[in-house]
Amino acid sequence: MLQQDFITIQLPKNELVIMPTSVLTRLHQYRQLKFWHKEKGGIFLGRYRGQYIEVTDVTLPQHDDICGRFFFNRCSSLHQQTAYQQWQNSNSEITYVGEWHTHPEQFSTPSTQDITEWQSKLSGSFESMLLCIVGQSTDWFGCFQDGVISKETSSSLTSCPQNYQL
């Protein structure tokens, strides 16, 4: 098995997100570094394994998505189709585990619009949902659980979390 680097993100309520750095690298390709760059986004796919949320893949921006300098609206059905295909191909193990999008700011934080949309979209979720805003320099990670949005408590780069079997 190939050695792979992961980022681990500690969420409130003792949950840990495990994400290959290759996924984060793909997101960073959409950073809004120039004034003409528009917000982009997609969804996280992965599995829930006890206290872990394992991110396995991500959907990337699609042509049908609506975006501007300060807004992103995921409209393309390809995000849903990709999630459904991975769910089918994994015997219902891989599923939608969260959302990501970019912001045109050095140190990203959720806007009032982000919070309102997440509360509206995710209010029926039974599991914790991973949230990410990709900034120009740093990324904001958080989760939506039980109607509450919380920021991650820490993140680090590791080869593989202790006591975790891939």
Please provide the spans of the model-predicted regions.
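Conserved beta-strand-loop surface patch within small alpha/beta domains used
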Residues: 1-96, 105-166
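Histidine-centered divalent metal-coordination motifs
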Residues: 101-103
